[in-house]
UniProtKB/Swiss-Prot annotation:
Pfam families from the UniProt entry: Ribosomal_S17
Record-linked Gene3D superfamilies: Nucleic acid-binding proteins (2.40.50.140)
Xref: HAMAP family: Ribosomal_uS17_B (MF_01345_B)
InterPro entries per the UniProt record, alphabetical: NA-bd_OB-fold (IPR012340), Ribosomal_uS17 (IPR000266), Ribosomal_uS17_bact/chlr (IPR019984), Ribosomal_uS17_CS (IPR019979)
Name of the molecule in the record: Small ribosomal subunit protein uS17
Length: 88
């Protein structure tokens, strides 16, 4: 199997940076929505992911895209792909 097909199967999430205090690491909050089975109301779930930011370019409030990668540390399994929108 080619490397490009394998790379395309990795999870890609878009979220908001909530912390950039660590060196080369950002914390990204990804919101997902699910419908409640009885009341049919949309409920927001959020999850935090640690991501590798090699050049320390993402700042708090930025909207970023992260991609799954090999384990980089105990909690880090994602890397920064792109900064979609800069914060003011």
């Amino acid at each position: 199997m080619s490397e490009t097909n394998e790379r395309n199967r990795r999870h890609v999430y878009q979220g908001r940076v909530v912390s950039d205090k660590m060196d080369k690491t950002i914390v990204v909050v990804v919101d997902t929505y699910k419908n409640h089975p009885v009341y049919s109301k949309r409920i927001r779930y959020s999850k935090k992911y640690y991501a590798q930011d090699e050049n320390n370019e993402a700042k708090v409030g930025d909207t970023v895209r992260i991609m799954e990668t090999r384990p980089l540390s105990r909690k880090k399994r994602f890397r920064l792909v792109k900064i979609v929108k800069k914060s003011v």
